[in-house]
Amino acid sequence: MINLDGKTALLTASGQGIGKATAEAFVEAGAYVIATDINQESLSLLKDVVNETHILDVTNYNEIKKLIRSIQAPDILFNCAGIVHNGTILESTDDDWDLAFNLNSKSMYHMIKEILPVMINKGGGSIINIASVSSSTKGIPNRFIYTASKAAVLGITKSVAADYINHGIRCNAICPGTIQSPSLEQRLSDMGDYESARKQFVARQPMARFGKAKEVANL
């Protein structure tokens, strides 16, 4: 991890998984860390680790605006909030589509839109968006809406990177595979046969195991 002394990092979905591991990694690197999540119970676990915690529903644009106005200017934005929707196109509804795009894509659009003027004023910054191997390198069965929404994240990332590089602002995406996390455990349990589902998920991993949140954070 690089030295982040004197830098301020703002993260979404910090209560568990990749978001939590990244918040901890930023602290270790010396950053002033502002962690957000919609789940107060999960976020409370970071209260004594990071510098600030804030409850945030990233699908609520007014909450995003209010947060950005209330905190010190971030040098780093880590967009991690997202949801995995299961199903093919024929098994998907408009409500499913709207939920996934609002959380996986539109929330990043709003976070970036509010943070960019702050970073421009500071003379630079770094924006990191969590995308997925699903949409970036391959399609995954039964992940139609998820794949589409994460493809949008890649488009957002590339466009912002091209538009604001001359302002000293970098925008990159990380495209993880399946990561061991509480949300993954819940999805496996929801599939009915936990052990069978877990074996199927592991079987399609190139390393024959799930990735670890800390491995992503260390990127």
What does each model-found stretch correspond to?
Residues P176-Q186:
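Short, flexible catalytic-loop segment of classical short-chain dehydrogenase/reductase
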Residues S92, K138-T147, S159, R187:
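Active-site loop-to-helix junction immediately N-terminal to the catalytic Tyr of the SDR YXXXK motif
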Residues T88-I89, D96-F101, F201:
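Substrate-binding pocket helix/loop in short-chain dehydrogenase/reductase
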Residues I112, S149, T157:
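Active-site helix of classical SDR
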Residues S132:
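Residue(s) in the substrate-gating loop at a strand-loop-helix junction
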